[in-house]
Amino acid sequence: LFTTIGFYDDYLKLTRHKNGLSGKKKILGQMIITALTFWFVYKYGLVNKTIDFSIINPIIKNSYIYITPILFFVFIAFVIIGSSNAVNLTDGLDGLVSGPIIVVSITLLIITYLTGNVKYARYLNLYYVPQAAEIIVYLAAVIGALIGFLWYNFYPAQVFMGDTGSLTLGGILGIVVIFIKQELLLPIAGF
């Protein structure tokens, strides 16, 4: 859904306004999309109808921060919108965003595999995420698409990502870390 905001921004830049959407309108649209996504997952997307409203510290063993659902939503919105805009701000020069996103996606793919396997999750003291294999397939598709894109985005660039791609990729990274309960790992992996 972040793709629509990015596409509209790119469309405005090409046709009407050279600046595109204002930052406030982008953030407002991202907040609305995040709220709708959170509501949809909370209402329809869960197998056992329970959500763990905790934040897991990836550095300290068995370290959980329990928060209220409202604060959890604010935290989720911060993670998704923050990662989306961080990728958008990074996108600029030839291949500048594709390479790091490939590295971060590979890192998240490995962590997702480990959290989706009961033995590895228990051994490494990770939060077990049942049915994480679907996320692995999605991340593998993103990595493959980015490798293909990087070929044409490297100097001299023939294709540019624009806000359509960068907002989407950042949103994907934010949602993946939320689904695998490794929200605090994203800044570490992206650094």
Give residue ranges: language-model regions:
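Carboxylate/His-rich catalytic cores and anion/metal-binding grooves
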Residues: L28-W39
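Interfacial loop-to-helix junctions that mark the boundaries of transmembrane helices
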Residues: G20-K24, N62-T68, N125-I135
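Alpha-helical transmembrane segments
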Residues: L1-T4, T37, K43-Y44, K49-I56, ...
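Alpha-helical transmembrane segments within multi-pass membrane transporters and channels
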Residues: T4-L12, R16
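Glycine-rich adenosyl-nucleotide cofactor-binding module
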Residues: S63-I81
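Membrane-interfacial loop-to-helix junctions in multi-pass inner-membrane proteins
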Residues: T15-G29
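Interfacial loop/helix-cap signal at membrane boundaries in integral membrane proteins
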Residues: T50-T68
